Amino acid sequence: MTLVRAWLLGIDTATPWRSLALWHIADDVVWRDTAPLGRGGAARLVPDVAAFLSAHDVRRDELAGIGVGVGPGSYTGLRSGIAAALGLGRALQVPVAGSGTLEAMAFGALERGGSGWALLDARRGRAHALQAERVGTRLRILRGPVTVPRSALADEAGECFEHVPPDAVWHARNALTSTPPQPRYG
């Protein structure tokens, strides 16, 4: 029997949510799971990933790669997500790539198309912001990521998405890029 590694795993823990996704390369099958991260979320991450894989009958040796959110976002959240992805990648001998959390937020919020701003609180009246347009399964970055005063966004066109979880499918789809996971703390 020949083992086919056809699944890509996406992980994001940079925001108040823990987002997981599985994407099948050939069949375009997608599964998502998002839950509040909360206290102790980092300790639950690896068991959550194992349960997520099991719930969808995907064995670890069927993973072809892992994509992980690199922020901007929570320092502890970023560290736990990236460390878990790197540990799993090393154990399974699969590539691990990083992609932006703001991009993953825009990808999910703009699922039906259109354009808008993904925002994360940068504190002190500032926001991490990215303006994007969704075209099919692609995301076209119009501006950003930038960190700006919130007041600067008041005159910008487009809907703002701030309290939405990142769509980890974005990270899964980018799992086979050659971008190493370098955190963007903000």
Residue ranges of each PLM-predicted region?
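DPxDG-like acidic metal-binding loop motif
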Residues: 65-98
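Generic short alpha-helical segment signal, independent of protein family or function
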Residues: 50, 71, 93, 110-111
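Phosphate/pyrophosphate-binding loops at sites that engage ATP/ADP/AMP, CoA/4′-phosphopantetheine
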Residues: 49-65
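Short amphipathic alpha-helical face segments that pack within enzyme cores
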Residues: 44-47, 83, 87, 104
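Oxyanion-binding and handling regions
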Residues: 1-30, 36-44, 58, 97-186
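Short, well-ordered turn and helix-capping elements at secondary-structure junctions
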Residues: 34-37, 49, 72
